[in-house]
């Protein structure tokens, strides 16, 4: 029951974060302290409709970040190699969504994506 309560609380949190976001003409970045992989995916998926570039959701983990990135305009499968190379990352996925982990700092990530912070 506790697991379901946490999932429901995360869903409400993600919905509130997305509802508070104004659409933007750039990349959109979310930095979170602790979200499950499913909630991180939901944040990136929901955010991609609010930006013209990439919506990237990051969760702090082991001195780096887990990430999920989603986009309606950028081929992320093609971009994954350069993103991972620039930010000491591992991961990949499909053209519309990639996931993995990075060892970069928040400052390095923000500098790379030049996005609006959600």
Regions found by a protein language model. Give the residues of each.
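Terminal appendage regions of diverse proteins
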Residues: 1-118
């Amino acid at each position: 029951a506790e697991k379901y309560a946490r999932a429901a609380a995360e869903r409400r949190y993600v919905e509130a974060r997305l509802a508070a976001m104004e659409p933007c003409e750039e990349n959109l970045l979310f930095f979170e302290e602790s979200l499950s992989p499913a909630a991180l995916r939901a944040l990136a998926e929901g955010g991609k409709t609010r930006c013209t570039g990439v919506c990237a959701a990051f969760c702090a983990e082991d001195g780096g970040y887990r990430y999920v990135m989603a986009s309606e305009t950028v081929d992320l499968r093609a971009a994954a190699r350069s993103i991972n190379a620039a930010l000491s990352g591992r991961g990949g996925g499909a053209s519309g969504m990639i996931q993995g982990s990075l060892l970069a700092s928040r400052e390095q990530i923000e500098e790379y994506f030049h996005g609006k912070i959600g």
